[in-house]
Regions:
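Cleavable N-terminal signal peptides of Sec/SRP-targeted secreted and luminal proteins
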Residues: 3-18
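Residue-level hotspots at or immediately adjacent to binding/recognition sites across diverse folds
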Residues: 21-363
């Protein structure tokens, strides 16, 4: 009887596995999209990208710069925080932004010691309040993520402190943050392992699950958790890691299907083993069949188009129509971050003030 149950269970598991991992049938291999640049009138680099709707988008980046558009990129308004005379805006680089409306957003600045900070606005960027300032010498904050289902719940992620990735958590949309301090349950890092503050997506929240991407070790690794207070599991990503290489971005469209991208930012066109996909919630990661054209710092699923995702990096952009198995290049302009919102609209941002939009035609 027990054997029978075991066999039945195995059969069920096998069926479930096969169903979950069915190869997507790519329907829309046809037209490739193209980016349209918008006039930001600045040369700052924007690694922080926060689209809210088709019209409202925020970007954040170097020299303490934050811009917002309310008209789909036709015009951009400088809504940067004002720094006191003793604090030079040039020292601040906002590598990540999360925005909920034209009024409400939080930004993360990177750096050693107290340069790692989080600011919050409720009035469209007219005023910003510092709601977190790092006091740990070893910490260096890289990225943050908020849940779609519980938008007030977010986690910001730092490089390791005492051998474990440092995480801070907010339950009120970034007004207050506290360190998740249970040593035994935080993700343990290998020597030399860290995260990339390249696009704000080295931590991901999707369908009630959390993911953390790492590099500096080979291969780059991906941690996952259904409850960050209780513990983390980890997997090899199948993406090659090195001093400047590993997993830069991990994104899930639901509880099962995820894509990870990365590579070596010092070798922008090297593309061996720089992208992988998972269909079991990040337990196993499989190498892509054909890779994007080079190092990619960010990837975003396109909502409403089941197996479509867009990846960007300093050497260009790529699209997949089969959930990350095969990638096709479209455009070679430099970008750091990409986000897609409803109705096949994506935004990308990067160096030299580049912020661009693409609208995919009907499927
Ligand atoms: C662009 O920026 C320059 C220098 O900051 C400024 O003088 C000019 O008015 C801006 N142009 C637009 C269209 O915003
Ligand atoms: C701010 O820093 C920049 C770059 O380090 C420097 O060029 C500038 O003079 C500084 N400004 C002030 C007011 O200290
Ligand atoms: C950051 O550190 C500098 C140098 O130690 C100090 O002068 C400044 O007051 C600190 N700022 C904050 C917000 O902690
Ligand atoms: C976590 O570990 C560090 C170093 O091992 C130790 O100093 C610290 O007290 C620990 N914190 C907690 C909350 O256990
Ligand atoms: C992950 O990769 C490391 C380094 O190659 C290897 O030692 C380890 O066994 C791998 N873990 C799994 C679960 O495959
Ligand atoms: C895409 O990847 C699949 C494996 O999932 C492979 O069988 C297929 O031939 C590839 N398609 C193209 C167009 O390269
Ligand atoms: C990028 O694309 C443009 C337009 O297709 C082309 O003229 C240019 O040579 C390309 N640059 C590189 C570095 O491939």
């Amino acid at each position: 009887m027990q054997n029978l149950i075991a066999i039945l269970t195995l059969a069920l598991l096998a069926t479930h596995f096969t169903t979950a991992c069915q190869t997507p049938t790519s329907t829309s291999t046809s037209r490739l999209p193209s980016w349209t640049l918008t006039p930001t009138n600045t040369t700052q680099q924007f690694r922080g990208l926060g689209p809210v709707s088709n019209d409202i988008v925020w970007v954040s980046g170097t020299k303490g710069t934050v811009l917002r558009t309310n008209d789909a990129g036709s015009t951009w308004t400088d809504v940067s925080p004002h720094f006191s005379l003793s604090e030079n805006a040039s020292n601040f680089e906002f590598r990540d932004i999360e925005a909920w409306s034209a009024n409400s957003a939080v930004i993360l600045s990177i750096g050693e010691g107290n340069l790692s900070r989080i600011y919050q606005t409720r009035d469209g960027g007219e005023t910003w309040k510092m709601t977190f300032v790092n006091q740990e010498a070893a910490a260096f904050y890289d990225c943050m993520a908020f849940e779609k289902e519980i938008p007030s719940h977010g986690i910001a992620r730092s490089d390791p402190v005492n051998g474990r990735f440092r995480l801070i958590e907010t339950w009120d949309s970034g007004s207050h943050w506290s360190i998740l301090s249970m040593n035994g349950t935080l993700p343990a890092a290998l020597p030399g392992e860290f995260g990339f503050a390249a696009s704000g997506t080295c931590i991901e929240a999707a369908a009630g699950r959390w993911y953390i991407a790492t590099g500096g070790v080979d291969p780059g690794r991906i941690f996952r958790s259904t409850n960050p207070r209780l513990g983390w599991h980890l997997s090899n990503s199948s993406i090659t890691g090195a001093a400047a290489a590993g997993v830069f971005s991990v994104r899930f469209r639901d509880a099962k299907d995820g894509i990870a991208v990365g590579g070596d930012f010092e070798k922008p066109t090297a593309n061996k083993d720089i992208a992988s996909w998972s269909c079991d919630g990040g337990v196993e990661w499989h190498k892509a069949v054909s890779f994007p054209g080079g190092y990619r710092s960010d990837v975003a699923w396109v909502p409403g188009r089941k197996d479509t995702a867009v990846a960007v990096g300093t050497s260009g952009s790529d699209i997949t129509f089969d959930g990350g198995r095969n990638w096709t290049g479209f455009g070679n302009g430099t970008f750091d971050a990409v986000e897609c919102i409803n109705r096949g609209v994506c935004w990308a941002s990067g160096a030299r003030g580049r912020v661009a939009k693409l609208v995919m035609g009907d499927e």
